[in-house]
Regions:
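Alpha-helical transmembrane segments and their immediate juxtamembrane cytosolic regions
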Residues: 1-367
Length: 367
């Protein structure tokens, strides 16, 4: 779920599948399908990001790229949502009946805005806005890539090849240890989720090296599909935030799901489905806007059931509806952000084009 790079390959398709699964997982809450998706959908993104990790880049160069591709988009989206806080309050998206924290319950005055500046923009806790609830991923991916790049710089200075492998192997027990004792660091936050992300990130990096030797076929895809469909019968509500005694099982389940997505992506690549490429290349926009888009369906449910507008404050969706509404949530959660991205780019191009024509128009008027 990195910033759009307009690539057409099986990883782009895997990202498309991942972002579709993410939207479905947020829409189909407390369901069997939700449990299947949460086995692997976030690890898939860390895996895909690690797949493209350039171990020849310098740490400074990677830092610049990460700031440009992760922090700056994060900053722009969170700044917009932050400044529009009181608008969302008037729209009942934030209200006292369904808000879970002070942020999502109250109208903000100057002192309230100032109180959250460091938390949201320095500590990158954009998820507190709720509307950008998925932005915890951006923070974790940023630190994951920087920590990996830092260890790679040490590896290059030592002229060794084992430092990243060592980081991979120690990240697994460290993720368990940090979750058990709730270990964190200033700015970075909880270290357990970061070490889990590093594990999947490095597995993606090494997967790319050995992928030419791996065979994707319909039989392996079907086998992994059966596995991920069977696991939720024995394990309810899995996610990257499972208790420490289940983390090992989660690693295994996530890798099965990742292999399934890569297999499907590899098989679909031959059909050159442009929609999947478009979705995969605009995954960041979908991440940012799908919770906003859900409010369209929630508003319709409120209207036909004569509910209070405060129900717009329920995140991510209004539960207890029939499956048709979950499907509707999924569709708008994917396509409204895509429409926004498409028309926004058309608008920007039109503005740039008009600006470029101003000198020409001035010259014509002078004649």
């Amino acid at each position: 779920m990195i910033r759009q790079g307009y690539k057409n390959n099986h990883i782009t398709i895997a990202k498309a599948l991942g972002i579709i699964f993410m939207v479905m997982g947020h829409a189909w809450t407390n369901t069997y399908l939700h449990d299947i998706i949460y086995l692997f959908h976030m690890p898939l993104f860390f895996f895909c990001s690690g797949y493209f990790f350039n171990n020849e880049d310098s740490f400074i160069n990677i830092l610049k790229k990460r700031i440009n591709k992760l922090y700056l988009p994060y900053f722009k989206w969170t700044l917009l949502v932050f400044l529009l806080h009181n608008v969302f309050y008037y729209l009942h998206i934030y209200n006292k009946n369904f808000g879970l924290t002070y942020y999502s319950q109250n109208y903000f005055y100057i002192k309230d805005f100032s109180k959250y500046i460091f938390n949201i923009f320095i500590f990158m806790n954009g998820s507190e806005t709720r509307l950008l609830g998925g932005f915890w991923f951006i923070k974790v991916l940023l630190w994951t890539s920087l920590i990996t790049a830092f260890f790679r710089s040490i590896e290059k200075k030592m002229n060794a090849t084992v430092v990243l492998k060592l980081l991979l192997f120690i990240s697994i027990p460290l993720s368990i240890l940090c979750r058990k004792y709730n270990i964190g660091m200033p700015i970075i936050g909880s270290l357990d989720i970061v070490f889990m992300a590093i594990t999947f990130y490095l597995l993606g990096f090494y997967w790319r090296k050995y992928e030419p030797k791996i065979t994707y076929n319909i039989y392996s895809v079907l086998f992994t599909l059966i596995c991920i469909c069977a696991i939720p019968y024995f394990w309810k509500d899995p996610s990257m935030f499972v208790p420490q005694n289940l983390i090992i099982y989660y690693y295994i389940s996530a890798l099965i799901g990742i292999f399934f997505c890569f297999g499907v992506s590899f098989l679909l690549k031959r059909y050159n489905i442009s929609l999947l490429y478009y979705i995969g290349n605009h995954s960041f926009t979908i991440l940012a806007l799908h919770f906003f888009s859900f409010k369209i369906i929630s508003l319709w449910i409120i209207y036909i059931n004569h509910l209070s507008l405060d129900y717009l404050g329920i995140f991510p969706v209004i539960e207890g509806c029939n499956s048709a509404y979950y499907i509707a949530y999924t569709i708008v959660g994917i396509f409204i952000p895509l429409f926004f991205s498409f028309f926004y780019r058309l608008f920007v191009k039109a503005v740039v084009k008009s600006i470029l024509h101003i000198p020409l128009i001035c010259n014509i008027l002078k004649q």
